[in-house]
Amino acid sequence: MLNIVIFGAPGSGKGTQSERIVEKFGINHISTGDVLRAEIKKGTELGKTAKGYIDQGQLLPDELIIDILASTLDSFKESKGVIFDGFPRTIAQAEALKKMLAERGQEVSVMLDLDVPEEELMTRLIKRGQESGRADDNEETIKKRLVVYHSQTAPLIDWYKNEGKYQHIHGLGTMDAIFADIVAAVEKL
């Protein structure tokens, strides 16, 4: 079972590389962002609650995310593994993921950290916002998201290093070059 956590700041290429990993290794993809955006679009209670946090550039409460994740994970019957995109974002979530997988006789295989300089992240996100119309890709919200990332999410790097699961991926360069580094890291497992 190949369970990958793909990690990096907003705009680091997690979604793009996740799609390629899914195709290459035949695993399922759980993007908490995509799941939440679908709930928002449907106008569900969960979606309305999530929208309030997202519009403010805030992280959602752990219980909310973990419930969504457990339900999505259990919907995959015959699976070679999962790539977790956008989760975990806090140490508490990483511990909850470890417990949730252990209850299913699984574990995280590797945490891939897509490392991209902040100036490049800003450029990518502003461009993405202009092209996609995503409300959370405006300059003010981007800056808030990066502050939240550095204060709440970045400590996960040390947590996964201590777990022996951390793999640094240089996130600048062509999509193909970055993907080649990812494949090399995964195939070493």
UniProtKB/Swiss-Prot annotation:
<feature type="binding site">
    <location>
        <position position="145"/>
    </location>
    <ligand>
        <name>AMP</name>
    </ligand>
</feature>
<feature type="binding site">
    <location>
        <position position="134"/>
    </location>
    <ligand>
        <name>AMP</name>
    </ligand>
</feature>
<protein>
    <recommendedName>
        <fullName>Adenylate kinase</fullName>
        <ecNumber>2.7.4.3</ecNumber>
    </recommendedName>
</protein>
<dbReference type="Pfam" id="PF00406">
    <property type="entry name" value="ADK"/>
</dbReference>
<dbReference type="InterPro" id="IPR027417">
    <property type="entry name" value="P-loop_NTPase"/>
</dbReference>
<dbReference type="InterPro" id="IPR000850">
    <property type="entry name" value="Adenylat/UMP-CMP_kin"/>
</dbReference>
<keyword id="KW-0067">ATP-binding</keyword>
<feature type="binding site">
    <location>
        <begin position="86"/>
        <end position="89"/>
    </location>
    <ligand>
        <name>AMP</name>
    </ligand>
</feature>
<dbReference type="GO" id="GO:0044209">
    <property type="term" value="P:AMP salvage"/>
</dbReference>
<feature type="binding site">
    <location>
        <position position="93"/>
    </location>
    <ligand>
        <name>AMP</name>
    </ligand>
</feature>
<feature type="binding site">
    <location>
        <begin position="11"/>
        <end position="16"/>
    </location>
    <ligand>
        <name>ATP</name>
    </ligand>
</feature>
<comment type="subunit">
    <text>Monomer.</text>
</comment>
<comment type="similarity">
    <text>Belongs to the adenylate kinase family.</text>
</comment>
<feature type="binding site">
    <location>
        <position position="32"/>
    </location>
    <ligand>
        <name>AMP</name>
    </ligand>
</feature>
<comment type="pathway">
    <text>Purine metabolism; AMP biosynthesis via salvage pathway; AMP from ADP: step 1/1.</text>
</comment>
<keyword id="KW-0547">Nucleotide-binding</keyword>
<dbReference type="InterPro" id="IPR033690">
    <property type="entry name" value="Adenylat_kinase_CS"/>
</dbReference>
<feature type="region of interest" description="NMP">
    <location>
        <begin position="31"/>
        <end position="60"/>
    </location>
</feature>
<feature type="binding site">
    <location>
        <begin position="58"/>
        <end position="60"/>
    </location>
    <ligand>
        <name>AMP</name>
    </ligand>
</feature>
<keyword id="KW-0545">Nucleotide biosynthesis</keyword>
<feature type="binding site">
    <location>
        <position position="128"/>
    </location>
    <ligand>
        <name>ATP</name>
    </ligand>
</feature>
<keyword id="KW-0808">Transferase</keyword>
<dbReference type="GO" id="GO:0005737">
    <property type="term" value="C:cytoplasm"/>
</dbReference>
<keyword id="KW-0963">Cytoplasm</keyword>
<dbReference type="InterPro" id="IPR006259">
    <property type="entry name" value="Adenyl_kin_sub"/>
</dbReference>
<dbReference type="GO" id="GO:0004017">
    <property type="term" value="F:adenylate kinase activity"/>
</dbReference>
<feature type="binding site">
    <location>
        <position position="173"/>
    </location>
    <ligand>
        <name>ATP</name>
    </ligand>
</feature>
<dbReference type="GO" id="GO:0005524">
    <property type="term" value="F:ATP binding"/>
</dbReference>
<feature type="region of interest" description="LID">
    <location>
        <begin position="127"/>
        <end position="137"/>
    </location>
</feature>
<comment type="function">
    <text>Catalyzes the reversible transfer of the terminal phosphate group between ATP and AMP. Plays an important role in cellular energy homeostasis and in adenine nucleotide metabolism.</text>
</comment>
<feature type="binding site">
    <location>
        <position position="37"/>
    </location>
    <ligand>
        <name>AMP</name>
    </ligand>
</feature>
<keyword id="KW-0418">Kinase</keyword>
